[in-house]
């Protein structure tokens, strides 16, 4: 069995598969992904594979520079997105946006 390249919380799986979630915002430990990378995607909770994505763009962002566009790409409100990011990455300010599409 091949290892997964990136994981998402299970609660995001349906939105990813339906194309409602088209970005992920990560910390520096996952800043190495590049446009064109093809990644196996698993669930964080059990590492179970559920799809393959292609990275379509990457950029940097801070909590203060998150926009409504980012929120829409995450299928959340901007307030929800800022809270989720702050909860997952407390005390961090610099983040990496990975835009993707399911293959």
Curated annotation (Swiss-Prot):
Coiled coil: none annotated. Residues 6-101 form the ASCH domain. It catalyses: N(4)-acetylcytidine + H2O = cytidine + acetate + H(+); N(4)-acetyl-2'-deoxycytidine + H2O = 2'-deoxycytidine + acetate + H(+); N(4)-acetylcytosine + H2O = cytosine + acetate + H(+). InterPro entries: AC4CH (IPR008314), ASCH_domain (IPR007374), PUA-like_sf (IPR015947). The keyword Hydrolase applies. It comes from the Bacteria. GO terms for molecular function: hydrolase activity, acting on carbon-nitrogen (but not peptide) bonds, in linear amidines; N4-acetylcytidine amidohydrolase activity. One of its GO terms (cellular component) is cytosol. Keywords: Hydrolase. The active site is at residues 21, 24, 74. The keyword Disulfide bond does not apply. Its EC number is 3.5.1.135. PANTHER family: UCP029143 FAMILY PROTEIN. Belongs to the N(4)-acetylcytidine amidohydrolase family. Catalyzes the hydrolysis of N(4)-acetylcytidine (ac4C). NCBIfam families: PRK04980.1. This is N(4)-acetylcytidine amidohydrolase.
